Amino acid sequence: MIRHSTSTQVAAPLGAYLQVTKPGIIMGNLIAVVGGFLLAARGEVDAVLMLATLVGLSLVVASGCAINNYIDRDIDAKMQRTCRRATVTGAIPLKQVLGLGIALGVLGFGLLAWFTNLAALLFAAFGYLVYVGLYSLYMKRNSVYGTLVGSLSGAVPPVVGYCAVTGRMDGAALILLAMFSLWQMPHSYAIAIFRFKDYEAANIPVLPVAQGVEKAKLHIVFYIALFALVSTLLPLAGYTGVGFMAVSCVTSFWWLLMALKGYRSDVNLLRWSRQVFGFSILTIAILSLTMALDFQVAGQAPLLAMLG
């Protein structure tokens, strides 16, 4: 007779609950939050505020992911990548998934409300409502512009980190919002290309499925080029230094070259889209780290003024 230890019995459901919150997405967002927070802190870090911001926003993101899993259970069942999720297999009762999402949201927003400020709280709420309400409930299923709308919510974490320190929306916060929104587009389109059959099976109108892979290639190149230009605004406006400018130009240029390879006649579409996707993650992680380290202290002239 096979015996199962108590630890094994507990680990399985705990693992299922953890997967519902999409820990990979949480970790990716944490890197962006740290970048925005340290950019604003300019070397004067409030450890308690930073910890509260990271934990609070992580809980908010986890809440959004759990509720997204609850909403998407019907389309997840049609996709090979997602058909084994707990909301599809029944590993966790749907009421518990919804309850978990609500509880995490209450805790996350509570922490942000108590420790941060109104600007950070409002941006977190904006991102949450766009992701759960507008994107998950409607745009993802019904519009080719779902990716564009969803990109706004994906760009919120670094802005929340920044505003947690400054308490206001300023030029740097706007640049971060634009920069991370633009990054989301080629990142998401690349996923949609190498997961084309999944999205097609679930009847999700992402650009490659709705309007063709060739148009998606064009959009990938366009958004990477625009992302590269917007990224230079941080050093040009004096929020970061020459180091960030150099790293931004190198990574963006390499990413753009990689995207242009999609037009080669002998391109392996699956491999190419995975490369564009993989380098997108590396790019945003490197830039988040660089902005955290290459901030400009008060009183230093903007790079644009130095060039002039």
UniProtKB/Swiss-Prot annotation:
Pathway: Porphyrin-containing compound metabolism; heme O biosynthesis; heme O from protoheme: step 1/1. PROSITE patterns: UBIA. Keywords: Cell inner membrane, Cell membrane, Heme biosynthesis, Membrane, Transferase, Transmembrane, Transmembrane helix. The keyword Cell inner membrane applies. It catalyses: heme b + (2E,6E)-farnesyl diphosphate + H2O = Fe(II)-heme o + diphosphate. It is an enzyme of class 2 (transferase). Its EC number is 2.5.1.141. It is a multi-pass membrane protein. Coiled coil: none annotated. Belongs to the UbiA prenyltransferase family. Protoheme IX farnesyltransferase subfamily. This is Protoheme IX farnesyltransferase 2. It comes from Shewanella loihica (strain ATCC BAA-1088 / PV-4). The gene is cyoE2.
